[in-house]
Amino acid sequence: MPKIYQYLNFSIYIYTNDHLPLHVHIFIQDRQVKAELLWVKNELKILFKKVSRYNALTSAECKEVAIFVKQYEKKIKEKWDKIMYYNQPVKAEVIKKKI
């Protein structure tokens, strides 16, 4: 499960051999959500889902992550494709500045 981003205190991962739709797993402390990236009429929609065995992120945290995901959607998709379709390693990027 490669980490693709460290954004502020959020760790963002893509699990290898995972399933569609394109999604990322976001951790902060001992909490996690899954963020599905869906394109409806060429507009990105982000659907946050609770992951079993984990407490979810707060709504404020999800809003912060949504801003990041919208800003980095193309890079996230590129990393998804490299991991899922080409079995290529990706480097985790660290973003310390709030978007």
Residue ranges and their predicted role:
Residues Y15-T16, L20-S59:
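A short, structured beta-strand/loop element
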Residues R53-I99:
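Acidic, low-complexity intrinsically disordered segments
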Residues F10-Y15, W80:
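Aromatic side chains
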Residues M1-I12:
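Negatively charged, low-complexity tracts enriched in Asp/Glu with abundant Ser/Thr
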Residues Q6, Q29-Q32, Q71, Q88:
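Residue-identity detector for glutamine
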Residues I4, E43-V51, Y72, I76:
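Generic preference for hydrophobic/aromatic residues in regular secondary structure cores
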